[in-house]
Amino acid sequence: MAAACRSEAGLLPSLLCRRPAGAQLLRVALCLLCWVPAAVDAVPELGLWTRTVNDKSGPLVFRKTMFNSTEIKFSVKSFSCSGPVKFTIEWHLKYHTCHNDYPDLEEELSQRHELHADPDVCAYFKNIDCWTTKSENLDCSSDSQAFPSLNNKELTGIRNISSQEGSTDVVARTQKDGFHIFIVSIKTEKTDAVWDLNVSLSMVGPHGYISASDWPLMIFYMVMCIVYILYGVLWLLWSACYWKDILRIQFWIAAVIFLGMLEKAVFYSEYQNINSTGLSTQGLLIFAELISAVKRTLARLLVIIVSLGYGIVKPRLGTVMHRVIGLGLLYLIFAAIEGVMRVIGGSKHLAVVLTDIVLAVIDSIFVWFIFISLAQTMKTLRLRKNTVKFSLYRHFTNTLIFAVLASIVFMVWTTKTFRIAKCQSDWMELWVDDAFWSFLFSVILIVIMFLWRPSANNQRYAFMPLIDDSDDEVEEFMVTSENLTEGIKLRASKTVSNGTAKPTSDNFDEDLKWVEENIPSSFTDVALPVLVDSDEEIMTRSEIAEKMFSSEKIM
């Protein structure tokens, strides 16, 4: 959730409240912001695979974005052969420029295998950037203790290969940075032979098992983890220095910082684990997604309660807080489902697509809530002429506007580069699609931290009942006026036959006596002291009243 940006400091708040067209445009921009990925787009690419292959299996296909000079190792860990069998194992390494090339390669190769056709893989790729090697006459029988080693003889003479551990299993080496497809085809002389192989494939680059597209993302998570640690230390120092003046909103900020630090640490540990072992720990990934869902939910709630003026304009949110928490719980549930299903079933799973739609709708509600609340809060502060708090929210609004504009520009760029491009070749920039949103929120968070930081002037931003309740003065005055008139009796008037009202007494002294007996002294002396007139005003009013009574007598 969540978004923010800078503009003209003095003009923006007035534009938000005075220009409906501009407000509608901002609302549309905020709604567009919701249709963006909320977390890591997919599971990191593996670097180590184990497969079971038998006489009925088709070619094995592996895809990965690799650095130049990445070593591909292939070995048979265990085997089972019904009789003497001679194997021919071919491997094909294909470099391709576009990430979206050959989406149906696995299905086509399986169909050719079922038709017992001998597929020429490099011919399928038109022999462009495709390298083929093979090992022939590999004997396997029930008496064999070990499967013959596999290696590419063309690579054994290269410097430093013989000194590396497991170099005898190196069957291919990449020559470029980019997208690669590695295909393993296992054949036997006897088509009716029964056999079973348990094979292992690893791809080790200059930095480890991690792919070329995930390497920058791992560094990014490490840097962001350090950034959040610095955020936490800075916030802790601020809070320790001014712990007596801590506001309630500042506890929310501390919770978001802690969850952000935990989220980045868990994701970094998962990427580091893949880089070290080549395998992904599904439980760790699920835990990371759940932490990410909690953090994103709390981050959205933080922006909402800041926009509502919690602790700044209002001492409590009342029933509005129930709606905010309910919306947050709804988002948390669907965000957790989306993250777990993406780890288990992949980003194209039906449940992931449906939850993405629901999350987009909930995010739209969040954005609408934030926009309406922020506009109302700034309007209230402007009416109260509270320049200190108004300046605070003006800077916060400018930050949100900046983030909205930055998000729109980024979405246009990613759509053009990764979504609708015929050739998705910018693999070096894939990590930006995931990292941008985390970086953008960290910018919003540091702005919120700076604006709402603990300081000696904390109480200038805190809710002050004697000052901030001015918008309720009219209502309170009406209630007080009703209570003050409870002890006042209405003076009855007599009417004559023609319906004309007649004074109850012709004597002005009797009228004054009636006032003294029926109007409580507390009303004039205590409740409304400002209504007590001076002696001169009383004499003037008495003369006017006498003239009115005299004119009525004459009539």
From Swiss-Prot:
Main location per the UniProt record: Golgi
Instruction: Name it.
Output: Transmembrane protein 87B
| Membrane-related topology note | Multi-pass membrane protein
Task: Give the source species.
Answer: Mus musculus (Mouse)
Topology, Cytoplasmic side: 238-248, 322-323, 373-394, 451-555
The family database entries (InterPro entries) matched by this protein are listed as: GOST_TM (IPR053937), GPR107/GPR108-like (IPR009637), TMEM87A/B_GOLD (IPR054101)
Leader sequence range is 1-42
**What keyword terms does UniProt attach to this protein?**
Glycoprotein, Golgi apparatus, Membrane, Phosphoprotein, Signal, Transmembrane, Transmembrane helix
Among Pfam families, the record links this protein to:
GOST_TM, TMEM87A-B_GOLD
For this chain, the family text in UniProt reads: Belongs to the LU7TM family. TMEM87 subfamily.
Q: Offer a single GO CC term for the protein.
A: Golgi membrane
